[in-house]
Structure formats: structure tokens, C-alpha cells
Amino acid sequence: WKRVTGVQTCALPISWVRINPCDGQGITDDNITEYRHCLVESDTLSVEEQWRIVTSLNIPCAAVVFSGGKSLHFIVKVHAGQNRKLYDDRVQQLYSVLERYGFQVDTQNKNPSRLSRLPGIWRGRQKQVLLATNIGCESWQEWVIQPRAANIARWVATEPPIQRFVFKGIVPEGAICGIDAKGGLGKGWITQTLIMSACTGKTLLETFIPDGPMKVLWLESEDPESELHRRFKKIAAAYEFTEWDLHRCSENLIAFPGQSFPLTRPAGGSVEPTEHYEWVYGKVKEYQPRLIVLDPRSHYYGGDENDNTQVGRFMGLLKELTGAVDKGAAVWVNHHTSKEREQQISSASGRGASAGRDAQRVLFGLSGMTLNEVQGFKIHDPHLYVRMENTKSNWTERYSKVIWLKRETGDLGGVLKQVDLSRTEELK
């Protein structure tokens, strides 16, 4: 205590302490040797409200210090070792949770070399005080898995956030969406058309109106790059892309074609993320795409396709990818149907454990024309037509109309365009 009281007359910097250990060579982020803690502070809330929110969330705090001003310093355990990316991800996750509960975080404190107030030092007429140590959960891991109650008082006092969409009214941000259908019906063509629509902000299929040009991350393993290249050229020609449209595709699309790799592996009765998942997560965080596409699911899933626990965990990891995008994103995952359900269009037609389709908020199915439809519409070449239906929609009204698509022929063979079968000219 004599040492503490003895520094009262020293220069101001003595009243600070760094929240993470340094190497002795400097005091920047590059000099941090271990990412143990992050700093949480708010200059807009009362200290009583700061204390209430943090303690109610059971956040794992190594220490809580009264700054001698208008804030508390919460030194939070993040246990990120020497992994800076993990540190940044956990800080962002922590700050996001706090913001949802009304704690307006000073985000300037996010870097690991931040300083906190040294307890026992006077700041003007106020003393910097150590209020608590080791409160909340014992560790970051324990805190992350604990359920958190919703802030119902906020529900009552405020309006809910507006649901945002990647494709207006039909593909919401924050959701896992996709197509479940048997092979050969056009999943890949439709998906690539939607990708190019999203990149350009140009409506290609009338039902799917993109919310402006956006970045897209595309993992596609069923077809080689050469085939996707050919399809790209055909789609661009069929939809009369301008030089500006092509430029936007070049700027906004990052694709990894013809490569499959497991994002999960079996572990302890469930699955755990692999190094490939961490790589994809890093790409999402770096690139900030609003649409993330995996086609097909089976080529990126490492586990038992019929195990609900494992599939559910895998889908949960895909959902976590949306949280790495600051402005929100949707994940589009294509999957094959089971053999016995190939002739059906329903939300239950996907192959394997039901946890996969349960996790998807929006689903589409594909089929060919029935004999009655061929006769009713007087179709001469029914193999050119594909029926697309919105079989599931949890966050918005389900699109109830049948979406009819027609294949181009000749040099543009394979390209699908949406058609209105009530119009005679569409049937030619």
C-alpha cells in the first residue's frame, strides 16, 4: 500500500495498467504475448446500469474497476491464448451480446493492448476502486454455452428490428436457405443464376429481387471450374450482361469451384469444426459477403448424414457464419433428396437426418412437369420446364405460387429463365 500511495504524486500514466501481458519491448498490439482479457466500458450508461447488465449476463470478469469518472472497467476473460483472430472474434461476440441487452459499448477498447485504471489511485477527487474480482462464469467457455434470457423489457419498450433480405421478401438475412432436389433438375444452374443476380444487383429470376449488388462467397464442388466458367458465359449472354454487370461479378464474387473439404469431423458423439471451417470463417470475416453458398451440403459435411445431433451441430456452425458478417448474411445450402422422395416436392424431401431441413428457414424444391400439366399447358417439350416451389418459409410469408423455369436451347443450352405459363408466347 505504501507503494500505491507513493505514486499519487507521480505522472498521470502511472495510474494505468495494461490488461494483457507484454513482451517488454513495447506497448502496442504487436507486443502482446497472450490474449487473456478484453476491456468492456460504456461512457453513456450510469455505473449502476453498467453493473446490472454485466452481472445479469454472468460475463466472466477477472476484475471490475471503478474508473474514478463515469464508467466501470470490466476486465473480461476471453482466454484466446496467442490467437489474435480468436481474440478479435470473441471480443466482437461479447460486444454484440452486450449491445443486444442495451449496453452501449465503447468499441475503441477492442484492441488487446488497452489500458485500464489502476485501483487505489486518486483521479482528481475520486479514487479508482477495485470493486470485484472473478465474478460471473469461471471461464469464457462456460459463459459461451450458457443460455441467455431475452430482454423482455426491451421488447415492451422498443420496436423490433426490421427484417432485412438478401432477395426481397423471400431470402432473409441471418437464415440458412437452399434447394432440396434430385440431381439433374437444375439446382446448380438456378443457384449460379441467383449468385450472378446478387453480385450485380440485377433481377434475373423475377421472383428473386436482389437487395442491391452484394458480395458472394461460393463453395461449389460438384462441377469443375471449366464447367462453371462455361455456365457463367452462357448466363451472362442469356441475360444480356453489360460490361458494368461483368465488372460487378468480378468485384463481388469469390468462388472456390471443384473442391470439396469437410468443415466438420466426428467428435464425442457430435461433430467439431475442422481447420477448413476455421479457414472459411476467416474468409467470411475478411470478405464480408451477404450471401454464402455451399453446393452440395454432403461435400462439406464430415459426419453421419443420418445422425440428428451431428447434422444439427453442422447446421449450427453454418449459421454462425452469418454472425461474422457485420451487415448480415444468408447461407444458401443445396442438398439432394432421398431416393424414395425424388418425385415429391416438400420440406421433408431432403436426404438424411431431419435436423438439416429443420435448421433451414427457407427451402425450395424442384420437379419436372406432370402429365396433367403438360396437357393442360399444351407443352411440346416438357423436358425444358422445371417447377420450383417454396416448400418452407419460417420468417416470412411463404411464396405460394409455382415458379416455372424454362431451359434455353442451342448455344445457351442449360440456362434457366422464369416464365409465365399463362402467356401463350412463353409456350413456344
Role assignments for model-derived ranges:
Residues R3, A62-G69, D106-N111, L246:
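Short beta-strand
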Residues V7, A11-K70, K77-Q93:
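Signature for HUH/AEP ssDNA processing cores
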Residues V40, C61-L86, S113-P119, V331-H336, ...:
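Histidine-centered divalent-metal-coordination microenvironment in nucleic-acid enzymes
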Residues E49-S56, V78-F103, Q126-V144, N372:
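Helical (often loop-to-helix) elements that flank the catalytic cores of nucleotide-handling enzymes
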Residues I75-Q82, Q104-L130, L253-R265:
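Short, conserved secondary-structure transition motifs
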Residues Q146-I235:
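The Walker A/P-loop phosphate-binding site
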Residues G178-I179, G184, G188-W189, L291, ...:
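Phosphate-binding/switch region of NTP-binding enzymes
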Residues D211-E305, T409, E425:
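Conserved inter-motif catalytic segment of the P-loop NTP-binding fold
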